[in-house]
């Protein structure tokens, strides 16, 4: 995975990881789980690696959904979280939407500059390990410039 990340981002490093669980009751709406809204992560290109800790069903398992090809967009404002959210109707009318699901031990790699969401719809819980890769020096430069952007994400265990 390190070679994939460096091939895509230039020299890259794993900056952290976290475990994410979407329950069927407490996070079945976008008010309690804001990552259920279509969004990009406000930091330009970075990769997240998702590893399924159990089977993730495509319809009922809260799969991550991505708007295919949206990683090519240029965003002119990234300072506020609200500016990174997109209406479901807009995304579905303008992009092919892919559901990222699969068996335990499987997973995927996604550029979080891509419009994506964790589906809030579903009757089965989803638990994944998420690793985050950035170009070496990118987060330090953002911090030095006091940009206040989530690089690395603030809710992970740093490596």
Question: Where do the language-model regions lie?
Answer:
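Residue-level detector of short, conserved catalytic/binding motifs and their immediate flanks
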Residues: 47, 106, 127
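Non-heme Fe(II)/2-oxoglutarate
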Residues: 79-81, 113-159
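Conserved double-stranded beta-helix
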Residues: 1-66
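Histidine- and/or cysteine-centered catalytic micro-motif in compact active-site loops
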Residues: 41, 52-56, 69-71, 113-115, ...
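Short histidine-centered beta-strand/loop micro-motifs
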Residues: 34-41, 100, 118-121
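Short, surface-exposed loop/helix-turn segments at secondary-structure junctions
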Residues: 33-37, 81-93, 144-148
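Double-stranded beta-helix
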Residues: 57-115, 138
């Amino acid at each position: 995975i390190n070679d994939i990340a460096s091939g895509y981002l230039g020299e890259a490093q794993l900056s952290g990881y976290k475990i994410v669980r979407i329950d069927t009751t407490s996070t079945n709406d976008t008010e309690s789980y804001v990552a259920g809204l279509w969004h990009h992560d406000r930091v330009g290109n970075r990769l997240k690696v998702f590893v399924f800790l159990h089977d993730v069903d495509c319809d009922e398992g809260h799969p991550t959904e991505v708007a295919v090809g949206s990683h090519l967009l240029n965003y002119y404002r990234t300072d506020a979280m609200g500016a990174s959210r997109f209406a479901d109707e807009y995304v579905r009318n303008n992009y092919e939407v892919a559901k990222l699901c699969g068996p335990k031990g499987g997973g995927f790699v996604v550029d979080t500059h891509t419009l994506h969401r964790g589906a809030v719809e579903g009757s089965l819980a989803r638990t994944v390990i998420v690793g985050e890769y950035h170009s070496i020096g990118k987060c330090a430069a953002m911090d030095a410039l006091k940009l206040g952007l989530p690089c690395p994400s603030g809710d992970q265990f740093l490596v």
